[in-house]
Amino acid sequence: MNIKEGKFLETILAEKKQEIAQMPDENSKPIRQTYRLYDYLKKHSDQLQVIAEVKKASPSLGDINLEVDIIAQAKNYEQAGAAMISVLTDPVFFKGNIEYLREISKNVQIPTLNKDFIIDKKQINRALNAGATVILLIVACFENDFEKLEELYNYAISLGLEVLVETHNKAELDRAHQLAAKIIGVNNRNLKTFEVSLQNSTDLVPYFKEENVYISESGIFGKKEAQKVAENFNGILVGTALMQANNLTKSLTDLKIKRKNDEH
């Protein structure tokens, strides 16, 4: 599906509403047992931690790695020291599938993140039942409806899920803090234009709160970019660079930069 420039998020959300309308309403099951991401990031704050993403395609890059064996990729991420595996489940724009999350979650011991444009409780139940222990809530998806964001956040927490709350600017970061979110992402990609700049991460650092953990997302392709954010971020979310890596273990290990501000 083609997306008009500047209308990325709008187009995706319109499609997502159609997807949700067809989605069965599942009863939530008990959460899969693994460590808590927040606790892990606090405990291992001496190194920049990597959230490694299973991503076959994206609207900005097109096909990234369609032939990948998703279970082998996920197991390799786990063995290489990823803190969590992010799994894209959007079928239309990212060629993802909820079954990828289900299969990966069955085959790894570490936390899994349902990476999707979540705007409804049905999606949260589905994520939990597919083995996710963390879900993504993107503040930009709730531009004029903070109450809905808060409702979904609290609902996910009530089920035992952790929530990565994604922000892109100061106003959205304020929203995340207002929620009392503990795990906050800063997306270096503008979801309206899909342009990427690490400046997004840098600009928001002065407003960080010591009790939270912060993840820099998008635009991190190697050691150089990782070093730029390592001092102020607990972790990074990396997809394309790892999906295309010739030596996955080395590529992931290289990203785990020693951090100066060890919080122990």
From Swiss-Prot:
This is Indole-3-glycerol phosphate synthase. It is an enzyme of class 4 (lyase). One of its GO terms (biological process) is L-tryptophan biosynthetic process. Pfam families: IGPS. SUPFAM superfamilies: Ribulose-phoshate binding barrel. It comes from the Bacteria. The keyword Membrane does not apply. Gene3D superfamilies: Aldolase class I (3.20.20.70). Keywords: Amino-acid biosynthesis, Aromatic amino acid biosynthesis, Decarboxylase, Lyase, Tryptophan biosynthesis. HAMAP family: IGPS_B. The gene is trpC. One of its GO terms (molecular function) is phosphoribosylanthranilate isomerase activity. It catalyses: 1-(2-carboxyphenylamino)-1-deoxy-D-ribulose 5-phosphate + H(+) = (1S,2R)-1-C-(indol-3-yl)glycerol 3-phosphate + CO2 + H2O. Pathway: Amino-acid biosynthesis; L-tryptophan biosynthesis; L-tryptophan from chorismate: step 4/5. Belongs to the TrpC family.
